[in-house]
Amino acid sequence: YVVSDALELQVGIDWRTAAIEHAREVRDLLGGDYYVDFADDNAPDGKVVRLGDEIAYHNSTTVDWFGAFLQGKYDVAKFNLYGMGGISTIGYTYKDHFSVEKELVEADNITTFQIKGGGRYNLDDRMSAFANIGYVQKPPILDNVIAYDGTVSQDPDNEKFISNEFGGEYNSDKVSVKLSSYNTQWKDRNLTKSVNTGQGDSGDTDIIYLTGVNQSHKGWEVESQIALHEMVDLNLAISNGVWKFDGDAKGDYQEMEYNEDGQVIGQTTTEYEYALDGLKVGDMPQTSYVGGLTVKPIEGLRIQGLYKWYDNHYSDWSPDSREVSGDVDRAQVWKTPSYGKLDLHLSYKLPTVGGLDMTLSGHLFNALDDVYVQDAVDNSQYNGFGDKVHAAHNAEVFLGTPRHFNVGLSVNF
């Protein structure tokens, strides 16, 4: 809705619902006539199943979502401002068809909201400064609200993102530079963990809902493009971040105690702690340097070399691996070796034929055929060796793809 030449508003609603069935199905009897499955509690002596029947597990879930938002932008003089606010609610249900009760488990609706705002100030035709700030709540996913055994988390916390960003830009005919700094605090990340407590109706395996899992993501970035010549462009970019966990986490498991008549006579609580404070967030390089040179020797031909260097890449790991049991393990997760790789790109716009615009392109990735660790898992359960000390021999590594290429032809008509 256009309020005035300077102010424009937009409002919207979002309603979604989904019903999902989860099951494992018999697809091949391997020459047999039937199979006996013992997963269904309604058939404790086993159930004869044939092609198309469900085995192992069978449950159904529903997800109901409703949201509304209002956003607007305001442009006046040298200022460009915007803001938005939204609210949503989500509800989950769960039914286990292999349980005797087959009860519909329904969790209370979860409400979230978000608010964002920001603006840009144009100092002149070439320079501008900008700032953004936001607070966003994210509801926990169904698995973190209702566990596979039907356990409902009591008052699950919404995940919260508090972020701000500020920076500046400079743009001229030959030089473009963007500098920005960011700070994002991720609060109350929702995680669950299966543990052997010796408690619970499910046997020795129970669900622990972790609280206090917080992350801090801070850093700065620089991007630039410089026209060295009408046929040569230089691209440079640097990104440096410090992403780590803030504080430790804990989780409680509470189990009701019953007498022979089924009456509640007490409660047993088991507390679990997780040493996370100061550990680096894994599975993503926190520092990168990019340099690129683009050459356009003739009209329609574009050749680019792009070299990327990655550093401070910590291996992937899960907070539940730092459960406090005896000596507290606060050793940093394994950091993979730094690495760089060169990619080459070429494109040529062919002459138009019969009204068809055609572009030939080719890409050579990892042109120097470097060997590097692209991903890793810290203290791998299955592929690590020796004592678990967060070292290279404890990690499971995935090497980057060797030199490879592709060639393509795009046609527009």
Residue ranges and their predicted role:
Residues 1-5, 11, 68-74, 117-121, ...:
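Residues on the lipid-exposed face of transmembrane beta-strands in outer-membrane beta-barrel proteins
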Residues 5, 78, 183-185, 209-321, ...:
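Gram-negative outer-membrane beta-barrel transporters
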Residues 7-9, 78-81, 126-129, 174-177, ...:
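Repeated loop/turn-to-beta-strand initiation elements of outer-membrane beta-barrel proteins
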Residues 8-124, 146, 237, 250:
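Signature of Gram-negative outer-membrane beta-barrel scaffolds
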Residues 11-17, 83-89, 129-135, 168, ...:
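Transmembrane beta-barrel strands of outer-membrane/channel proteins
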Residues 23-54, 149-155, 193-209, 255-273, ...:
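Surface-exposed loop/turn segments flanking beta-strands in extracellular/periplasmic regions
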Residues 91-93, 121-165, 176, 181-212, ...:
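Surface-exposed extracellular loop regions of Gram-negative outer-membrane beta-barrel proteins
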Residues 234, 300, 309-321, 348-413:
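C-terminal beta-signal and adjacent terminal beta-strands/loops
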